[in-house]
Design a protein with these regions (language model features):
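Multi-pass alpha-helical transmembrane bundles in non-GPCR membrane proteins
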Residues: 6-181
Length: 181
């Protein structure tokens, strides 16, 4: 069992598990957050060299949504506080799943699709995300199937513009899109 010394008035040995709720998840999600931050920099630099602010905006929305997901998850899995605080952290952690899915759609909708189709699809996905956020805010222990339906529904919204997405992307880019889910 991991042990460390807390320095202060008393020199006491405490287990890591007493202070960190889920060390494995806390560490891996923290690493994910750092990777998201480091990956955001070159993406935003590349976007800044493209014509129009829409590139930077769409990539920033994606990057921020990814960072927020990992930050919320790291926080939830790190701090073992009162039941009330843990419930709030769990709500935020679960809300960020909807934010990430919608954030992931943002560059596809604005940069790949564009126009009326892209804006419509973006509004649909962010609308579903808002429903998911509200459900998690007010019903954190809702049945898992409800969350699953929302997440899968958001993910499958792309079939509304599948042909246009397929025709607008290179085979390699489309392969990465499929690999990412």
């Amino acid at each position: 069992m991991s042990r460390f010394i807390i320095l202060g008035g008393n020199h006491m040995s405490h287990t890591l598990e007493e202070h960190i709720k889920d060390p494995g998840s806390a560490i891996t999600h923290f690493i994910g957050m750092l990777m998201a931050i480091f990956a955001a920099v070159p993406l935003l630099i590349k976007a800044a060299h493209e014509p129009g602010k829409i590139y930077v905006i769409s990539i920033a929305v994606y990057a921020v949504s990814l960072i927020l997901l990992y930050a919320a998850s790291t926080t939830y899995h790190t701090f073992n506080r009162s039941e009330k605080i843990n419930t709030v952290l769990k709500k935020v952690d679960h809300m960020m799943i909807s934010v990430l899915i919608a954030g992931s759609y943002t560059p596809i909708c604005l940069l790949v699709l564009g126009g009326r189709t892209g804006i419509t699809l973006l509004c649909i996905v962010w609308g579903i995300a808002l429903v998911g956020i509200l459900i998690k805010a007010f019903w954190v222990y809702c049945p898992k199937w409800i969350s699953s339906v929302l997440y899968i529904g958001m993910g499958w919204t792309c079939v509304l513009a599948f042909t246009q997405i397929l025709n607008s992307m290179s085979a390699a880019a489309f392969g990465w899109l499929l690999a990412g889910g």
